[in-house]
């Protein structure tokens, strides 16, 4: 049988099906140099030479096993390692650099140190709808004071009723904190359920308030508990003050009246 005689042009065309020479790799010590050919946006053939530093490191067994997985899809015939045509090692991050003048215009006109929200019930740094005292006696008192204050503006009109606690420049009834205690040095992970578990065995309580950070929602480190009876509040101070809880030493004292 006679050997088939082929043209050298056919052999070249078979090697370079897409008109580009195959990529080449050259290892020089700890560096690997990869030479590739491709077409740019203008349709011109260009040569791209990339250099990689070879590093050996110890990885977990799961990572080593994952690197031996069989490639599929467009990367089915690729060599080990990422292919720049089908794989992105990292996400592209676009950055816009601003000048000093542009930065001044973007400054928030509001003072960042001042709270944006203020509760009308307890004057805390949160919205009234999220107040822990909503629906309690404190909420009822605040609504009564607001309604009575509006009525004071019309005291000159005959027949208008003014509550006794607002007459003669009165500032309203003070909240009864005689059976309230302040628990401080709490951990950031403290929750209302943890606080309930901490004080429920001492005695019945009417309400609790766990102070939280406005942005993160973590505990600020203190809380208030209003016991039903003053003797239970005194017992809570005696039991919990200096008590170790969540790797911290609690400090419990009588709640001081607000000015």
Swiss-Prot record:
* Cited Pfam families: eIF3g, RRM_1
Kindly report the protein's main subcellular placement as a broad class: cytoplasm
- Spell out the subcellular localization from the entry: Cytoplasm
GO annotation (BP), single: formation of cytoplasmic translation initiation complex
User: Cellular component per GO?
Assistant: eukaryotic 43S preinitiation complex; eukaryotic 48S preinitiation complex; eukaryotic translation initiation factor 3 complex
Sorted UniProt keywords: Cytoplasm, Initiation factor, Protein biosynthesis, RNA-binding
Where would I find the RRM domain in this sequence?
179-257
GO molecular-function term, one example from the UniProt record: RNA binding
| Functional description taken from the UniProt entry | RNA-binding component of the eukaryotic translation initiation factor 3 (eIF-3) complex, which is involved in protein synthesis of a specialized repertoire of mRNAs and, together with other initiation factors, stimulates binding of mRNA and methionyl-tRNAi to the 40S ribosome. The eIF-3 complex specifically targets and initiates translation of a subset of mRNAs involved in cell proliferation. This subunit can bind 18S rRNA.
| Family of the protein in this entry | Belongs to the eIF-3 subunit G family.
Q: Tell me how this protein assembles.
A: Component of the eukaryotic translation initiation factor 3 (eIF-3) complex. The eIF-3 complex interacts with pix.
Q: What is this protein called?
A: Eukaryotic translation initiation factor 3 subunit G-2
Which gene does this sequence derive from?
A: eIF3g2
């Amino acid at each position: 049988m006679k050997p088939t005689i082929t043209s050298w042009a056919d052999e070249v065309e078979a090697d370079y099906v897409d008109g580009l020479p195959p990529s080449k790799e050259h290892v020089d010590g700890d560096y690997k140099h990869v030479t590739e050919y491709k077409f740019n946006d203008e349709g011109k053939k260009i040569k791209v030479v990339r250099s990689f530093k070879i590093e050996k490191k110890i990885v977990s067994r799961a990572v080593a096993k994952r690197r031996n997985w069989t490639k599929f899809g467009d990367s089915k015939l690729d060599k080990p390692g990422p292919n720049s045509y089908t794989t992105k090692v990292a996400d592209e991050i676009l950055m816009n650099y601003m000048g000093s003048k542009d930065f001044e215009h973007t400054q928030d006109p509001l003072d960042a140190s001042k709270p944006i929200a203020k509760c009308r019930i307890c004057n805390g740094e949160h919205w009234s709808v999220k107040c822990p005292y909503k629906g309690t006696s404190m909420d009822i008192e605040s609504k009564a004071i607001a309604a009575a204050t509006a009525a004071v503006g019309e005291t000159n009109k005959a027949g208008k009723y003014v509550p006794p606690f607002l007459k003669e420049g009165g500032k309203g009834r003070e909240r009864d904190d005689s059976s309230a205690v302040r628990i401080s040095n709490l951990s950031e992970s403290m929750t209302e359920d943890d606080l309930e578990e901490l004080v429920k065995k001492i005695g019945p309580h009417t309400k609790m308030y766990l102070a939280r950070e406005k942005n993160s929602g973590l505990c600020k480190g203190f809380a208030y508990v209003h016991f039903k009876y003053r003797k239970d509040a005194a017992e809570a101070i005696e039991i919990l003050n200096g008590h170790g809880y969540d790797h911290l030493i609690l400090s419990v004292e009588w709640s001081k009246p607000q000015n």
